[in-house]
């Protein structure tokens, strides 16, 4: 926790954010880094990506089902460590973005579902990555109807309780129990 507190301090995040999460008083739960990761191939930018084993199996099943139904489901990102999350926020701060605006689109280090190895950001052929217009695609509508079959859920719908902007591209594997994938 000391490392996380130091990262938060360096980025100018309030100490209360961590304190409230530790006490269970925050809408934002702390997300521990995955202990085990497996490769799931490259993302749309050619970068190797990883997920936790159960999420990786569910992702593979969902990707296969989408492809078999003519849906182009493409990976934008998977696992992101706490240090990498801090780098992302640091780059945005260096570019002059306001911290409060950054935190509407990027979770603070320690709070991103990507740390768990269970979250994916996705896109589809012809759509811009990480763009709200993804919700106008056949891929998004397929995910709404079928992602739950594989244990994935849309974490940040419009007006979500986390205060994160709408992210139709962000899906998180919830559990094997929720998954009907084989």
Please annotate each region the language model reported:
Residues 1-78, 83-182:
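Extracytoplasmic cell-surface/polysaccharide-interacting catalytic and binding patches
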């Amino acid at each position: 926790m000391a490392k996380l507190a130091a990262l938060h301090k360096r980025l100018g995040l309030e100490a209360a954010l961590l304190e409230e999460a530790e006490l269970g008083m925050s809408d934002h739960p702390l997300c521990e880094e995955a202990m085990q990761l497996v490769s799931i191939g490259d993302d749309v930018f050619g970068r190797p990506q990883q997920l936790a084993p159960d999420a990786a199996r569910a992702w593979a099943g969902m990707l296969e089902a989408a492809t078999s139904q003519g849906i182009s489901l493409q990976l934008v990102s998977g696992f992101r460590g706490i240090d990498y999350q801090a780098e992302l926020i640091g780059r945005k701060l260096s570019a002059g973005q306001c911290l409060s605006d950054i935190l509407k689109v990027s979770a603070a280090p320690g709070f991103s579902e990507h740390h768990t190895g269970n979250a994916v950001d996705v896109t589809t052929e012809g759509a811009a990555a990480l763009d709200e217009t993804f919700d106008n695609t056949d891929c998004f509508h397929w995910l709404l109807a079928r992602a739950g079959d594989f244990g994935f859920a849309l974490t940040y719908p419009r007006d979500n309780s986390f205060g994160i902007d709408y992210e139709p591209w962000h899906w998180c594997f919830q559990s094997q129990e929720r998954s009907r994938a084989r």
